[in-house]
Amino acid sequence: MQYVMGRTNSMTRGFLNKRRVLEKCRTAKQKIHYCISRYFHYLPPVLAILLPIGSWPFLSEQQWWYGSFLFPVVSSLGWLFAIGRRERQLRAAAGQLLEAKIRKLTEQDEGLKNIRETIEKRQKETDRLKLHNDKLVEQLGQAREVFIQAKGRYDHMEELSRRLKEENQQLQIQLEAAVRERNEKILENQELLQELKETLAYQQELHDEYQATFVEQHSMLDKRQAYIGNLEAKVQDLMCELRNLLQLEMGAKTNLPGKPVASRDVVAQLVLEFRKIVFRVETTEAADSLTALRYTRTDPSAHNYSLACRQLFDGLREENLGMLFIYAPFAQRVLFANALFNDWTGYGLEDFLNRESDVVLEGFAQWERDLLTESRVERSGKIVIKTKAFGATPFYYCVVTLDKGPFAQHILGVLYPAKASFFTNLSYI
């Protein structure tokens, strides 16, 4: 049915288009014939005007004459004006003559008058019907175009509906497959969840058993480590007391340097040996060997610091490089000074830091400035000390601010005799 309707519409459109083309061709031919028959008598004067104008570019200056050009132009214009005016007169006269003859004929014959009136009425009716027919033809063309557009839209909508229907079917199939897959995944997830719950319950039981065992063993380990820690602390205290007793027994027998050093190499060797002591002091840490203190829950920082200081002081007492000391500049307090201060000079380190004691005879300003400086760079110099046994004696000194270790930000220093004769005089005492 749709095919037959489409075929009929296409034939109708073809017929109407053909009829419209033929009507346009006939109208164009009538217009061309009317123009030629009406304006043919104007052709000669127009040629008379165009001929001199068209030949003007091809004439030389000697052949051209203004009068000969102007005369044809003016005469042609006059001819055209006269012909046009005469034509209008003749046309008006012919119209008046024709009307007069028709009026005379119709006035003389009543039948012709009636026929004329009838013809005029029919002519008016014909004109009206022709206008109405033209309007109907135009409306028919518009309706045909609207119908064609509607038919195209209908075909497009029908094709779109067909495609949407196919896509809907495909989406429905995909949706059913997705729902099926989702149901399978839900069943699988439920099974996995059940297995996971059982596994978690079993692991929780194992965790509870392991936790109880761990707490019990940890409690036993804490008791054993506390007992071991107490024993090690007692051993360390006994070792420190034994070392102190041995040092007190050997108090008067302080080890002196074996061989005096040449004066030009004293400072270099003093700094070299002093750097070794500085490295050992900065790398001294708390007593990490106390395994009991590692595992117990008590804070070992205070015990470790005091033990480290005791061990460090014991090590510095055994050094025979020179008069070693540790000084806190921010508190202006001496923390450590070995026994060589009293053995060599007869004074304590506090006397070296007091300007009014007159122990430092020369270089006190530089000595005090180096002690109060916070720079990490080694500072060395020379001062003259008033000793009780030998009087004024020059000493080299080297000081540095410790960067780390138990005594960070403290001053570590050493003093050494500048003359080798000092040890010779000391051996006679």
UniProtKB/Swiss-Prot annotation:
Family stated for the protein in its record: Belongs to the UPF0242 family.
Pfam families referenced in this protein's UniProt entry, alphabetically: PAS_12, UPF0242
Top-level taxon in the UniProt lineage: Bacteria
Protein name, entry field: UPF0242 protein CT_616
InterPro entries, per the entry: UPF0242_N (IPR009623), UPF0242_PAS (IPR040578)
